[in-house]
């Protein structure tokens, strides 16, 4: 089995089926929705019994033509090679109805990629269902050899842009990937550092920040930024996906991202019209003019 934020060889071009149970029309499915928006390699089917047979474009507004099916056996008609868990369930555990299709995928000879906190390769039932030359990639793992941060990114010559958000799930990653595409169109050298499960699944590398022990979190970000910056010229751009939120009371990720990136610029991402933290109406969002000192 594989673990850590480096994708298995060939992953970028492999044929994926996304396990999106109940997550095509909700934030629970944001990992899979992000892959549908931004993955360049093939996605051949989406499993969501709630929307089986419907048009992906009509359900999600995403301009990609992928069949939506009821279960894993139905997805096998489209010859997938890898099953990817496209859900970010609360608490990071594998729900039972998804587990059924994960087992079916492994027994059908597919590889499995998961960004859940639960390490699926260590699950005895799943491990024994896996075929001999297939992998289970648990990407939400602390990288090997993490150390403490030393502000080393401050010595880099290239630009370092860190996305920060007024709330969670406001589009920090999507904004970075849009900038990456824009930079490529202008032949501006740019690299993306994924820091969450979707960013890692899309780019094939990065650091799963919320799997890193807090003392090493800034150091893990620093190491990823230094890797991304290697060989970039002065006008090069390192785009670091933000995590958590500047204003959310549960968010711890902001500080290690600032420390590890030593950013030359911050990209503030906000959901237009939002005035309080999602599901916490008692916490108002500050005026954007107060958040950005002029």
Identify what each model region corresponds to.
Residues 59-76, 89, 93-98:
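Glycine-rich, highly charged phosphate/nucleotide-binding loops
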Residues 180-218:
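N-terminal phosphate/diphosphate-binding loop that engages ATP/GTP or pyrophosphate donors
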Residues 42-50, 113-116, 267-270:
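Short internal beta-strands
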Residues 146-192:
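Walker A (P-loop) phosphate-binding motif
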Residues 91, 101-160:
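Extreme N-terminal, non-catalytic leader segments
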Residues 44, 49-67, 199-211:
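N-terminal beta-loop-helix "entrance" segment that forms/cooperates
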Residues 118-125, 137-139, 143, 151, ...:
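Conserved catalytic-core segment of NTP-binding enzymes
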Residues 3-54:
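N-terminal Rossmann-like dinucleotide-binding module
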